[in-house]
Curated annotation (Swiss-Prot):
Enzyme Commission no: 3.4.25.1
Record-given protein name: Proteasome subunit beta type-8
PTM annotation: Autocleaved. The resulting N-terminal Thr residue of the mature subunit is responsible for the nucleophile proteolytic activity.
Gene expressing this chain: Psmb8
Positions of the propeptide segment: 1-72
Organism per entry: Mus musculus
Matching InterPro entries: Ntn_hydrolases_N (IPR029055), Pept_T1A_subB (IPR000243), Proteasome_bsu_CS (IPR016050), Proteasome_sua/b (IPR001353), Proteasome_suB-type (IPR023333)
């Protein structure tokens, strides 16, 4: 009601969008998604399934129509003795077209949770912002922060409800809770994995090669920063769909901090000079 007062609505009046459906016990707005409602789901448009609709365009060679999402990125995250390091590139592509060189592929869910973007940018941003809302509601209802495990499970449950409907998302959820640092991988199929190290995107094979050669649990913060920095920089050198700058975050016990934004061209030049 405080929001209605702020908007200037008279007391005692409730607009249609603010009323609950008494018969179902859930919200009357079919486009609202909330775990607090009895039937938390988004309304789908009438007609054929989204995957069948897209397939009908992709198979017609005479019209030369191709609606296959072509995208690329390189994101990584790994745990070590001082928390979790998250490093991503910043190049956004639409097929062979580079649409942006300054896209931040880390979504700041709350001061103790971070999510990465890999796949379709719209899907990643929408669902992780929805996750941020649910994490905030959990805090308001329970008086404590949601755990990293529970947050990743919420995102996985969202993906399971829309499995096979054309979503494209591969995200890493990292944070710090009562159990310490946590790192999970969640994709559009609802897959949820816990681990020490993950990398997603078209350049992940190159990033894994660098991380595997230098990763240790007892890394110092500066060594961990350099490892994440090198992994993204060398991945952008080999992968045409990755580039821009290296955005790096460090998840600590008292919350995340943004470490740096370094241009990959400058980094590769510096590494090349050091190798001579």
């Amino acid at each position: 009601m405080a929001l209605l007062d702020l908007c200037g609505a008279a007391r005692g009046q409730r607009p249609e969008w603010a009323a609950l459906d008494a018969g179902s016990g859930g919200r009357s707005d079919p486009g609202h998604y909330s775990f607090s409602a009895q039937a938390p789901e988004l309304a789908l448009p009438r007609g054929m399934q989204p995957t069948a609709f897209l397939r009908s365009f992709g198979g017609d060679q005479e019209r030369n129509v191709q609606i296959e999402m072509a995208h690329g990125t390189t994101t990584l995250a790994f745990k070590f003795q001082h928390g979790v390091i998250v490093a991503v590139d910043s190049r956004a592509t639409a097929g062979s077209y580079i649409s942006s060189l300054r896209m931040n592929k880390v979504i700041e869910i709350n001061p103790y949770l971070l999510g990465t973007m890999s796949g379709c940018a719209a899907d990643c941003q929408y669902w992780e912002r929805l996750l941020a809302k649910e994490c905030r509601l959990y805090y308001l209802r329970n008086g404590e922060r949601i755990s990293v495990s529970a947050a990743s499970k919420l995102l996985s449950n969202m993906m399971l409800q829309y499995r096979g409907m054309g979503l494209s998302m591969g995200s890493m959820i990292c944070g710090w809770d009562k159990k310490g640092p946590g790192l999970y991988y969640v994709d559009d199929n609802g897959t949820r994995l816990s681990g020490q190290m993950f990398s997603t995107g078209s350049g992940n094979t190159y990033a894994y090669g660098v991380m595997d050669s230098g990763y240790r649990q007892d890394l110092s913060p500066e060594e961990a920063y350099d490892l994440g920095r090198r992994a993204i920089a060398y991945a952008t050198h080999r992968d045409n769909y990755s580039g821009g700058v290296v955005n790096m975050y460090h998840m600590k016990e008292d919350g995340w901090v943004k470490v740096e934004s370094s241009d990959v061209s400058d980094l590769l030049y510096k590494y090349g000079e050091a190798a001579l």
